[in-house]
């Protein structure tokens, strides 16, 4: 009986020690907050224009976009790939005396060269849908200048948006 108790005590202390002897956890990922203005155009299919008209929003097929993007970059080491989390708030149609709100939450990746891709939900008065975006961010010193294209296919039709703006790296 004494040997059994000794063996159980040895096993109880050996397991936690073994678990602590494994490889070290990677260092915490560095994050960078980037936010800045966005400006661009959205091209609406006939079905989207009709859907907006049903909700008393009368616009042409091309509307202006003005807004703000909140971005958080997550990266580690110099691997070149950066994970992104973005919230994009836009007001469309200001050129036509209407304000159509839009909110997108995008999750994606950016390469060291600035090419980027993201996907996420988009909410507007025309409905809720999945947005697909791609683009490139050009850097000039501390200034980042993105050029992005997004496609939002819906039951009513398709929205295609082109946005640019800037952020400052701090």
Predicted feature residues:
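Short loop/turn motifs that connect adjacent beta-strands in outer-membrane beta-barrel proteins
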Residues: 23-33, 75-83, 114, 139-145, ...
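Cleavable N-terminal export/targeting peptides
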Residues: 1-29
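Residues that define the transmembrane beta-barrel architecture of outer-membrane proteins
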Residues: 60-66, 99-103, 124-130, 143, ...
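Short glycine/proline- and aromatic-enriched beta-strand/turn motifs that initiate or cap beta-hairpins
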Residues: 19-67, 167-169
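Transmembrane beta-strand segments that form the barrel wall of outer-membrane beta-barrel proteins
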Residues: 83-93, 114-125, 143-153
């Amino acid at each position: 009986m004494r040997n059994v108790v000794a063996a159980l005590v040895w096993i109880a202390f050996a397991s936690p020690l073994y678990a602590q002897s494994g490889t070290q956890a990677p260092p915490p990922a560095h994050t960078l907050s980037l936010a800045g203005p966005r400006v661009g155009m959205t091209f609406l299919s006939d079905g989207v224009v009709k859907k907006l008209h049903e909700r008393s929003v009368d616009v042409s097929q091309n509307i202006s976009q003005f807004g703000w993007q909140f971005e958080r970059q997550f990266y580690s080491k110099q691997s070149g790939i950066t994970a992104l989390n973005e919230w994009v708030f836009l007001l469309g149609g200001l050129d036509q005396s209407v304000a159509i709100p839009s909110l997108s939450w995008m999750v994606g990746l950016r390469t060291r060269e600035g090419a980027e891709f993201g996907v996420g939900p988009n909410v507007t008065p025309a409905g809720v849908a999945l947005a697909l975006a791609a683009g490139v961010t050009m850097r000039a010193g501390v200034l980042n200048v993105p050029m992005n294209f997004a496609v939002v296919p819906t039951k009513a039709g398709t929205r295609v948006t082109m946005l640019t703006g800037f952020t400052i790296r701090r």
